C-alpha cells in the first residue's frame, strides 16, 4: 500500500475550520511538555485544558471536545486519572488520542497502553519504535527516541489502525498517517524540531484537537501534521538554534498561512 502525498490545499481548508471551532482539548500529558503543549494549541487557535486529578478528569473529559493521553511521565496515580478520563470520553463519544511515549522500553506503560486500546482511541501518534512496540511487532527504543525510520513502521501502523479502527500516525523525517486502508505522507519540517523537547508531544495534542473536527478523520489528522511541519520549516529559517527556535515556532503556528506556503512551493 503506497502512501499518497497529503494535499496542502486541504490542510489550509482544515485549518480554517480548526480556528473557527477552537476545540477544547483536555491534555493529560507529561510534566516535561505541559507549557509547550498548551502554547502550541493556543498558537493554532485551540483551547487547551490541563486537568489531571482523577476526581476532575472524569467529568471534564465528558465535556471537552477532545482528549489527549500522553504517558511520558506516567505514575500509578496518573494512570488512574487517565483511565477515568478515557472511560468518560468513551462513554461520551469524545474522541481521544493516545501518545504511547517509550512504550517499548518500559513494561508498566506498555501494559497500560495496551489496556487502553480496548476503549477505542480515535488516533494514536508515536515514533516508529513506539508504533512497532504497540503493535506487538517489536520492543525496544531508547526511551522517547526512535531507533527505526518511520517508513519501517508503516506496515505495523496500518495493521494497528485496522485492528483498533482508528487513525495511526508514525512521525519522523516524513510523517505517515493511516486508517489501515488509505495512507498519507507528510514531508517537511526541520531537524531542529528534534533538538528541543516536546514537538512530538505537542503534535499529539494537535492531532487530538483535530479529531474533534467534522469530516474525514484521516484528512484532519494529516492536516495537523502538515501544520506542524510547515511551522517547523518557517521557524528554522528564522532562528539560530534550539533556544530561538521555540518562540519562532510558536509565532509560525500563530501566523500560519498554509495557502501562502503552498503557493511558495
Swiss-Prot record:
What Gene3D superfamilies is this protein classified in?
3.40.1190.20
Q: Which residues bind ATP?
A: 125, 171
Q: Which Gene Ontology BP annotations are present?
A: thiamine biosynthetic process; thiamine diphosphate biosynthetic process
Q: Which GO terms describe its molecular function?
A: ATP binding; hydroxyethylthiazole kinase activity; magnesium ion binding
Tell me the residue numbers annotated for binding substrate: 50, 198
InterPro entries xref list: Hyethyz_kinase (IPR000417), Ribokinase-like (IPR029056)
Per the UniProt record, one Pfam family is HK
In the UniProt record, does the keyword Kinase occur? yes
Reaction catalyzed: 5-(2-hydroxyethyl)-4-methylthiazole + ATP = 4-methyl-5-(2-phosphooxyethyl)-thiazole + ADP + H(+)
Which metal ions or organic cofactors does this protein require, according to UniProt?
Answer: Mg(2+)
Query: Which keywords does UniProt give here?
Result: ATP-binding, Kinase, Magnesium, Metal-binding, Nucleotide-binding, Thiamine biosynthesis, Transferase
Pathway as given in its UniProt record: Cofactor biosynthesis; thiamine diphosphate biosynthesis; 4-methyl-5-(2-phosphoethyl)-thiazole from 5-(2-hydroxyethyl)-4-methylthiazole: step 1/1
Magnesium in keyword set: yes
EC numbers on record: 2.7.1.50
Q: Which family does it belong to?
A: Belongs to the Thz kinase family.
Purpose of the protein: Catalyzes the phosphorylation of the hydroxyl group of 4-methyl-5-beta-hydroxyethylthiazole (THZ).
* Name this polypeptide is given: Hydroxyethylthiazole kinase
Species the sequence originates in: Salmonella schwarzengrund (strain CVM19633)
Q: What is the lineage of its organism?
A: Bacteria, Pseudomonadati, Pseudomonadota, Gammaproteobacteria, Enterobacterales
